[in-house]
Amino acid sequence: MLQTLKTYFGYDSFRPLQEDIIRHLMDRKDALVLMPTGGGKSICYQLPALLSEGTAVVVSPLISLMKDQVETLCANGIAAGALNSNNDETENASLRRACMEGKLKLLYISPEKLLAEANYLLRDMHISLFAIDEAHCISQWGHDFRPEYTQMGILHQLFPQVPIIALTATADKITREDIIKQLHLNQPRIFISSFDRPNLSLTVKRGYQQKEKSKAILDFIARHPGESGIIYCMSRSKAETVAQMLQKQGIKSAVYHAGLSSARRDEAQDDFINDRVQAVCATIAFGMGIDKSNVRWVIHYNLPKSIESFYQEIGRAGRDGMPSDTLLFYSLADLILLTKFATDSGQQSINLEKLQRMQQYAEADICRRRILLSYFGENTTCDCGNCDVCKNPPERFDGTIIVQKALSAIARSEQQIGTGILVDILRGNMSSEVTERGYHRLKTFGAGREVPARDWHDYLLQMLQLGYFEIAYNENNHLKITQSGTDVLFGRARALLVTIRREEAVQATRGRKRKATVPTKELPLGLPNTESGELFEALRTLRKRLADQEALPAYIVLSDKVLHLLSASRPTTIEEFGNISGIGEYKKKKYGKEFVELIRKYS
C-alpha cells in the first residue's frame, strides 16, 4: 500500500485517518468521510481504486472539477477519464469502451450522467467502488443542496456488493445523518478528520464601508505579489464592481457568477487555474470546481450566510499546506440583509441559527480558530496564534459616553432610524434624509462628529453584540433600545468597548509582510528554512514552461510546496529528485532531468 502511495503520489506516509479509511474500503465496507479541503480526501478512494480490480466510479458535481482531477491523475501516470456533456460523442464512446474493457482505473461522472448510464454502461463494467464527492450536496440541510444528488440512493439497489464512500469537507450532524439516509449506506463507519487548517491565518475587519474596503483589499493583495486569490461577494454586481476596481489598479482579475454565460465562466476559471489572472471576484458559485493548490489568499467582501459556507470557501486557500491568508469584512448592512434572506427562506429557524453562529465568529474576541473548530464539534484548549485576535488581543476602554450618544440619538428619533442615518446624525452630516425628517434639529445632531464614520459602524456592531439595541427586521430595520441599553443610557450601568486599532499600528505589531517565495518557519509545515528565493523563482519559471507545453495548470506539474522543498534540499541526481515528498515515479521520470539540470546551476 505504501509502495503504491509513493509510486503514484510521491508520499512516504499517510496523513491521519487515510490508511484506516483505505483499509475499511478495501474490506468492501461503506464509509462517510469528513475531511477539510486540502486534507487528502481524494487519496482515500484513488488509492483503493489502484489496488483493486476494476474501475472506481467517482460522482462529482462539476465538469471543471472532474477535468482538474483527471488531469492530476493522468499527470501521475494513472488511467482516468471523465464522462460528461463537454466531450464529443466520439470521445465518450471511446471512454465507454475503455471502461468495459477495464482500461480505466477511475471514471468521473456527474450525477445526471450516472443515472442515465446506470442500466447500461455501469452494468457492463467491473466496478471496484463508488465515491460520492462533495456529498453534502445530497442533503437539503447542507449549504449547497443539489436535487439531482438525491437520486444517488439507487446505487446500493443496483449494485449491492459495491462499497460506497461519501466524502465532504463540511457537514454538521444533521447533514451527516441525511447523507447516510439518502445514500442508503450500509452500516457505514464515519471518519471525521481534524478540521484544523493551521496554515490559514484568519482576520476580520468590522465596520468598513466601500472605499475603506477597496483600500484594505489593495493593501492586502500588495502583500501577496503575483499570488492567486479569490474575493467572494454577496451579489453579482458587487463582484463586477470589485473586479473593475482591481483592473484599474493593474491587478489582472476575472469575474465569475451565475449571470454569465457558461463560456464566460469557463474562461474565467481557466484563466485563474493557469495563472493568467491573479484574482477572481465571484459569488459563492465559484471554487468547488477547482483543485488549484496554490491559492494564497481568500477575501470575503461580505459576511457569509453560515460557517459551513465560510469554512469551505476559505478552504480554497493553502491546499498545499503553505501559509495562506484569509480576510472577512463584516458590517451591519450585511447582517441585516442576510437576516432578511434567512427569514424569508423555507428553513427560517435553521438558517437564522446558522447565521447567528457566523455572526458570533465575526464578533469574537477570543481565538477565531477555536470558534470554527468548536462549531464542527472539535474542542481545543489552545489558542492558534494565527488569527487577528491571538496576534493582537483586544483592549477595552470605558465607552459609556459613546454608547450614550448613540442610544440618545436613537431615542430622540423615536426609534425610527436604521444604522446608516444614525451615523449621519451622530457625525452631523446634512444628508437629504436627515434634513427631510428634521433630524438636524435633534440635540444629538453632530454629538459624535469627532469619531470617524468607520469607527461608529464598528461601535454599533459592538453595541448590538452587547445587547444595547435590537434590529426590528419587520420595521424597516429600525433600531430599538433594550433594557440593557436603557440602563447605560440613564447611567445605571457602564459600557466597555473594544479599542479600535488603526491599520498602521496593527501591521507594525504583526510584522506580517512576507515574501511570496519564502515559507513562514513558525507554521507546522515541515519545511526547512534554507531555501533560495532565486532558485525558487527559476524553478517556478521552468514549471510554467513545462505546463504550457502540455496545456496543463502549473500546479499539476509540481505543487508550490514541492518547489519549496526542491529549492531547500537542491537534489543533484534524478534519484534524489524522486525522493522529494510529492514526486512519484511517473513525474520523476518525466521531469527529473530538466529540474535537476536547473538545480545544479545553483549548487
Residue ranges and their predicted role:
Residues 1, 350-352, 381-603:
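Accessory DNA-binding and partner-docking regions appended to nucleic-acid-acting proteins
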Residues 25, 221, 272, 362, ...:
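Short helix-to-turn junction characteristic of helix-turn-helix DNA-binding domains
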Residues 1-8, 12-16, 20-42, 50-52, ...:
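Helicase motor core with emphasis on the C-terminal RecA-like subdomain
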Residues 347-376:
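Short, charged low-complexity linear segments at domain edges
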Residues 160, 225, 365, 415, ...:
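Flexible coil/turn residues that form the inter-helical turn or adjacent wing/linker of helix-turn-helix
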